[in-house]
């Protein structure tokens, strides 16, 4: 299996975390999105959307979109609950991550770290919705160790990378103790150093 990804991307980190935790062998192929490497003809042949992460399996099939890859790799493992309703709850968090968390928390980080904008340059809506997403996550974690069930799951993996890096987007986790404790639990459970 080959993982095409950018180490700086939280979406790519999800796939790496999952493969590492499940001890799935892979070759990492670095694609620097800031240098346009996901827009080359060679890469676009593999993924016409021009996005990472992308996994190419040994049989030549390719799969894009971080949460689809994570969920596929996790099938039959402890990362994906057996109970159909619990599986649906993991999907709920994973969809929420892509529509209500990542577009704000990750984009603020991207603009500050990679586009070298200042906090004052960020759109107020971006900051407000990112903070709201982190508040929603805090509420979802209050009184529980993980997002779904009593062990780490694909839902946690979907939300972990960009939440761990939220400070790079100007978001403060100091007032979100459940989230900070959850990050530490996930790092231990997933053997992230």
Predicted feature locations:
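GST-like fold's C-terminal all-alpha helical module
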Residues: 82-85, 94-188
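Juxtamembrane membrane-interface segments at transmembrane alpha-helix termini
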Residues: 190-192
């Amino acid at each position: 299996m080959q993982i095409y990804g950018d180490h700086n991307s939280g979406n790519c980190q999800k796939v790496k975390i999952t493969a590492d935790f499940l001890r799935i062998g892979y070759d990492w192929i670095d694609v620097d999105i800031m240098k346009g490497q996901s827009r080359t003809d060679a890469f676009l042949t593999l993924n016409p959307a021009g996005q990472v992460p992308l996994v190419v399996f040994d049989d030549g099939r390719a799969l894009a979109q971080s949460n689809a890859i994570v969920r596929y790799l996790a099938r039959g493992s402890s990362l994906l609950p057996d109970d159909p309703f619990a599986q649906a709850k993991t999907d709920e968090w994973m969809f929420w991550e892509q529509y209500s968390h990542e577009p704000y928390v990750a984009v603020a980080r991207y603009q500050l770290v990679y586009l070298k904008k200042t906090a004052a340059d960020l759109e107020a809506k971006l900051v407000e919705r990112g903070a709201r997403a982190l508040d929603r996550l805090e509420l979802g974690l209050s009184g529980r160790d993980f997002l779904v069930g009593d062990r780490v799951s694909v839902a946690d993996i979907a939300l972990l990378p960009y939440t761990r890096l939220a400070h790079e987007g100007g978001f403060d986790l100091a007032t979100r103790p459940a989230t900070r404790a959850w990050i530490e639990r996930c790092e231990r459970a997933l053997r992230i150093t």
